């Protein structure tokens, strides 16, 4: 089965490819389809943004399409950066810029109040417009400085208490198994392989 993953984010595409390695699903990114327009993520929720991206690209390409919107929600910041996670420090922000802004915004937050969660909503849409949503969540704590070299985004700052390591420090197989994206993708794959 072939599926378009509506992203140009190479880190995200690699993560999804690894998560689907043991399935019969072959993924392609947007770059495989030439000059497709960007979809403006103007929804108020992860679900709205994921659905809009998947439905638009499925219609334009005629392919079964999955899109996700995901991000970090920090309790002490009222759920920020939330849907703005990728551009928290500005539209052209790098991961390092976003991490720096998060640390600045949390500078006065004490150790026991740094709870956060990564959220992911995946939308699977057909070219005809039928869509299903799948979600995942990973709870953790934001550190005062980054640790680890792996992963991308906020991974170096996000401590997973059960492992005593950041997502950037965890072996890839563990990260993929427990991640918010991994959980959502597991639900999506189960749906694709369910009878009827």
Swiss-Prot record:
Coiled-coil region: none
Active site: 69 (proton acceptor)
EC numbers for this chain: 3.6.1.66
Cofactor note: Binds 1 Mg(2+) ion per subunit.
HAMAP family documented for this protein: Non_canon_purine_NTPase
Residues annotated as binding substrate: 7-12, 70, 152-155, 175, 180-181
The protein's required cofactors: Mg(2+)
Enzyme class, broadest EC rank: hydrolase
Family statement: Belongs to the HAM1 NTPase family.
Protein name per UniProt: dITP/XTP pyrophosphatase
Pfam families with a match to the protein in the record: Ham1p_like
One GO cellular component term noted in the UniProt record for this chain: cytosol
Quaternary data: Homodimer.
InterPro entries membership: dITP/XTP_pyrophosphatase, ITPase-like_fam, RdgB/HAM1
Gene Ontology MF terms: dITP diphosphatase activity; ITP diphosphatase activity; metal ion binding; nucleotide binding; ribonucleoside triphosphate phosphatase activity; XTP diphosphatase activity
GO terms for biological process, alphabetical: nucleotide metabolic process; purine nucleoside triphosphate catabolic process
Catalytic reaction equation(s): XTP + H2O = XMP + diphosphate + H(+); dITP + H2O = dIMP + diphosphate + H(+); ITP + H2O = IMP + diphosphate + H(+)
Role description: Pyrophosphatase that catalyzes the hydrolysis of nucleoside triphosphates to their monophosphate derivatives, with a high preference for the non-canonical purine nucleotides XTP (xanthosine triphosphate), dITP (deoxyinosine triphosphate) and ITP. Seems to function as a house-cleaning enzyme that removes non-canonical purine nucleotides from the nucleotide pool, thus preventing their incorporation into DNA/RNA and avoiding chromosomal lesions.
Keywords, ordered alphabetically: Hydrolase, Magnesium, Metal-binding, Nucleotide metabolism, Nucleotide-binding
NCBIfam families: PRK14822.1, RdgB/HAM1 family non-canonical purine NTP pyrophosphatase
Gene3D superfamilies: 3.90.950.10
Binding site for Mg(2+): 69
């Amino acid at each position: 089965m072939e599926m378009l993953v509506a992203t140009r984010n190479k880190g995200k595409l690699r993560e999804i490819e690894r998560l689907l390695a043991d399935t019969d699903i072959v993924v392609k990114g947007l770059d495989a389809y030439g000059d497709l327009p960007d979809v403006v993520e103007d929804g108020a929720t992860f679900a709205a943004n994921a659905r809009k991206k998947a439905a638009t690209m499925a219609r334009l390409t005629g392919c079964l399409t999955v899109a996700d919107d995901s991000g970090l929600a920090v309790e002490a910041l009222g759920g920020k950066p939330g849907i703005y996670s990728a551009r928290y420090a500005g539209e052209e922000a790098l991961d390092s810029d976003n991490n720096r802004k998060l640390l600045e915004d949390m500078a006065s937050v004490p150790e026991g109040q740094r709870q956060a969660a990564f959220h992911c909503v995946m939308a699977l849409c057909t070219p005809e417009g039928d869509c299903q949503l799948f979600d995942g969540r990973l709870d953790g704590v934001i550190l005062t400085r980054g640790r680890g070299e792996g992963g991308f985004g906020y991974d170096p700052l996000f401590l997973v208490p059960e492992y005593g390591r950041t997502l950037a420090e965890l072996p890839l197989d563990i990260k993929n198994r427990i991640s918010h994206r991994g959980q959502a993708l597991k639900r999506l794959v189960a749906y694709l392989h369910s009878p009827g």
